[in-house]
Amino acid sequence: MKWGLLVAIFTFSACNNTEEIENGGTNSKSKVTIDITESNYEDINTHTRAHVGETNLENLPELTQISDCSVATDVESDTAKDERAATRAITTPTHYKVRVYQGSTKVGELSGVLAGNSFTPDAGTSNQLDLKRNTTYTFVCFNEDVDSNGDNLEVVLAKAATARIGRSTFTTSGDGSTAMIKIVAKHAGARVRTKIMAYKHIVKPFKATFSSNTPDIPTKVSFNPLTNSYTTLSSAAFVAEENNSPLSTEAKFTGSGYGGYPGFTSCGPWHYVLPGTNVHHFQMDITEGQVYWKNIAGNIPKLAISDYIVAANGTYSARVPMKPVYTYLFSDGTTGSLAANPNKHAVAVVVDADQRLAAAIEEAGNGAKYVWQAAKYGYRHTAAKIVAGNWMPYSDYTFTNGESGYDNTWDASTSSSIVEGNKVRGENPDFPAFYAAAHFTPSVGVTGSLVGKKWFLPSELDYFYAVVTLGFTEKAELKGLYKAYSMYGLLFERAFKEAGGKPFLNDEDTKHFWTSTAFNGGGKVDLYGIATDFNSQYPDYEYKVRAFIKY
């Protein structure tokens, strides 16, 4: 077989770093071009299970609870679209070595600086390679952030972000025709970040750290160019790095389908690791941040629920979905979360802890519908206080002019002079909606401090407290009567459903509930999946009733 002398002369086009090699035999002459490009990080799924989409994160098992959040973790090969090309030309001066192997034997090496349209070989080194025709070779390139140890290439953790190694096999032609050898220099390390995911917009940026929970994070790896594999040489604990993340940028309310899935995100910075690193062995410590009601501070002990090993050039997000942890009133009069009280029975959801106000998880009368007042009163005002039907900010008709549903139900002075019989409307059958709320009893019964407590028909103000707390309606909104208030309606519903209660949004017919506010007749609240509004209705209409309680 005739040997050819391949003389390496690096030339470059606008988008490639190409080494043009002239094959100068006695009777023939051909060219072989080596094309070296650098790769961006890739979506490399090293896990066998299927990817968990946003809408299915709901089913992940709870890992821990921090403040008012139920936390799970899940790793994904990062699917964020990178607008850059998958590979790019080397435009800044970068030192590379190219080794050529025939089988397990190194038969040549080139070394120099690539930049723009030029290749400058290292002083005292050759720019020529002797290669056989019609022979298969393995080409390996690596930059100066990779250390050579014999044939093996070593990378330390400190260089995980910048070290690059490329590998390609190529068979030379037998007829001297021109061919292209493409080598893609890939990251020898991988990158990992945290992605906090919430069911509503994030209201306070996160301050946190990223560290390991074990001392077995690879700190040095060896790459075998012949087997194309990495081996861990040493391990240690991963020193804590800053992991702060910003407010979410998704549109309020719609960004999560009004609380239906964790669509609001706060991504931390990238942390660079070596191949073979297990994301299961990382943790996050949060000192500040807020999604729901409270500041979040605590430890997330592992960023993957099970082993998840990263690969070289991979990019990964440790997703941290956070659900709200609601506060419930239990049948014995105590309050707390469901997880902390597994043997207790919830009877109501706390909607304002300062006022000790809670809404029953069940409907009065098992979902029966009631009129606001008896037909004999017609459309005459039976309440001592009437909310006018003019436009006004919510602060005027709720806080300034608002009243307590407890008073409306149990205080005789809230009834007008035309009320016949008992002026306490909660005890007067002429006011079926009031009467149903006042005589509501949870199906599990009550004990302890709840014995003797009175349930009542909530006012519009009481309902407003509920939608602010459970649906995260913003108090800063200034809207008039009949105007809808945006809310995370599915988070509002979740509070009742998680405790086994009856949701408000059962169907189109049952989204309307009576309030005790007399607004040009009977006042009602309309609860939608995306919003709520407060308005009036003729008192002989029939709607459902949800009882509230002061515990």
Regions found by a protein language model. Give the residues of each.
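Sec-type signal peptide cleavage vicinity
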Residues: F12-Y326, A346, G378-S416
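Sec-dependent bacterial lipoprotein signal peptides
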Residues: M1-N16
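An exposed tryptophan-centered "aromatic clamp" motif
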Residues: D430-K454, E460-G529, K550
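Mature exported/compartmentalized surface modules and terminal targeting/interaction regions
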Residues: P301, S306-Y328, E508-T510, S516-Y538, ...
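Extracellular adhesion/carbohydrate-recognition regions
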Residues: S317-S443, V451, Q537-F548
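Residues that flank catalytic or metal-binding motifs in active/ligand-binding sites
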Residues: T94, A188-A190, A353-Q355, K453, ...
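Residues within well-ordered beta-strands of beta-sheet-rich folds
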Residues: V140-F142, R193-K195, A358-A360, K454-F456, ...
